[in-house]
Structure formats: C-alpha cells, structure tokens
C-alpha cells in the first residue's frame, strides 16, 4: 500500500473499485532480505522496505527464521490493511469498499493446500470473517472460501 499509494488512490477514488486486496505471499523475498539485513542493497530498495521496521520489531523474538518470516508477512498484511482502512474509512463505512488482507500460501503453511489464497483480515476484522455481510454474495457463488491466521 505504502509503496504504490497513488495507483491505489486512483483505483479507489476514481474507478470506484469495490474491493482492495492486500496480498502477501509465502517466502516473500523482500521481507526475507529485510530480516537478514540488507546492507548491500541500494538506497531505493532500502527506502521501499523501511516501513517494515515496526513490523519486524513485533517478530524479533522468534527463534525460528521460517516462523519469523511467516509471522512478519502476516503482520505486514495487517499493517497494510490498517493503513488502507485509515485512509479510506469513510468509503468502507458507506459500504462502497471492502479491504481484504490475504496470504498467497504456496508453501501450504495454513494446511489448506498449496497455492491457496487465505483471507486473513477484512476491514481490520480478523475474526469470524465468513460471518461478515461482505461475504453474503460470495458464499452463494464459490465452493470454498479459505480463511485463517498464523498469528493471533
């Protein structure tokens, strides 16, 4: 969201898109590079990733790197959804926009199958996602919706 704000604004404010999806993914190279330290990267790459610092601080005590990576990816999704929600709050409250946080799980970390998109957050709501009114129409047209979280 932060690195492409103008494009997102255009879609939400001018094209009136009804859904904004923030999609993170398994084994994210950008987050992996940030976690390992990225001293060799260019200034512009470092600047793109600087917003991760508050998120990294939440996962700094994880002993297992893979667990820290997955947890950081999900925190990043939540963080980006929160930013979008603050920015577009009035549009969301008027039911003109739904902000969905999702995790493209090509490593099967959620045990729902490889390559699934797992919904983790809707308009900052992380619980009872399938009960939200935003999914009324979707429930009738989709065989299965995958919802889950790796973190609380």
Features from the language model and the residues they span:
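Divalent-metal-activated hydrolytic enzyme cores
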Residues: 1-18, 30-152
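Conserved functional hotspot residues or short segments at active or partner-binding sites
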Residues: 22
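Internal, conserved structured core segments that host functional sites
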Residues: 26-27
